[in-house]
Swiss-Prot record:
Pfam family, one: Thymidylat_synt
Database matches in InterPro entries: Thymidate_synth/dCMP_Mease, Thymidate_synth/dCMP_Mease_dom, Thymidate_synth/dCMP_Mease_sf, Thymidylate_synthase_arc
Protein's recorded name: Putative thymidylate synthase
Residues of the active site: C139
Gene: thyA
């Protein structure tokens, strides 16, 4: 029997591993199967918010296919804006050289130094003149940094979020990015919150996810 359609849940997680396992559990047990515009079957839960209290410990879930070397490379590309593996684009390029014009991470750092309570330390990856005309578009859309209680916190919006394959790498990279920004600004890194409009797992990951969920329930 198909799950009743449901939108919106909040997870308060201790660390990245805890966030991943609990997110997979919600998607698997409360998501619905759809066929996406590319013809792939996914199991999807809409509007999943995950608040990670300490994203600096237990960053690599035991069951992920990502290892530390690959994760470090991913984080380096995110922070530096380099395209080490010759992708069509990287998040780092969009953050560091948006539309060939703006280093948004440098802007965020300077904005927070200038005005620690600013609500304008926001970086986006979507470029409408480009992304409305191509096949490969960013899943991570927005990164917002705020200093509160003497720490800089990060909220990230994903329009589409591959929880099975990409979430561990995304969060590892974001935790490193937040540490980088915090060091440059001169404050401690804080909480990371992700908002995933479409949190999903692809059909090729269903067996893996089912086994993981069985193991944690």
């Amino acid at each position: 029997m198909e799950n009743k359609f449901e939108i919106g849940r909040i997870i308060r997680a201790k660390n990245i591993s805890d966030a991943w396992y609990r997110g997979l559990n919600i998607i698997w047990n409360h998501g619905r199967v759809i066929t996406d515009e590319r013809g792939s079957q996914i199991k999807e839960f809409m509007d999943l918010m995950v608040v990670i209290e300490n994203p600096y410990t237990d960053r690599i879930p035991a069951d992920t296919a990502w290892n530390e070397e690959r994760l470090e490379e991913y984080a380096k590309q995110l922070i530096s804006g380099e395209n080490i593996q010759d992708f069509e684009y990287t998040y780092g390029q969009r953050l560091r050289n948006w539309n060939g014009e703006v280093d948004q991470i440098e802007y965020v750092i300077e904005k927070l130094k200038e005005s620690p309570t600013s609500r304008r330390a926001t970086a986006v990856t979507w470029i409408p003149p480009v992304d409305t005309k191509v096949n490969e578009v960013p899943c991570m859309i927005l990164d917002d940094f705020k200093i509160r209680d003497e720490k800089v916190h990060l909220t990230t919006l994903f329009r589409s979020h591959d929880f099975g394959g990409a979430y561990p790498a995304n969060l590892y990279g974001l935790s490193k990015l937040l540490e980088y920004v915090a060091e440059k600004v001169g404050v401690e890194p804080g909480v990371i919150t992700t908002v995933s409009i479409s949190a999903h797992v692809y059909d090729h990951d269903w067996d893996m996810v089912e086994n993981i969920v069985k193991g944690i329930n």
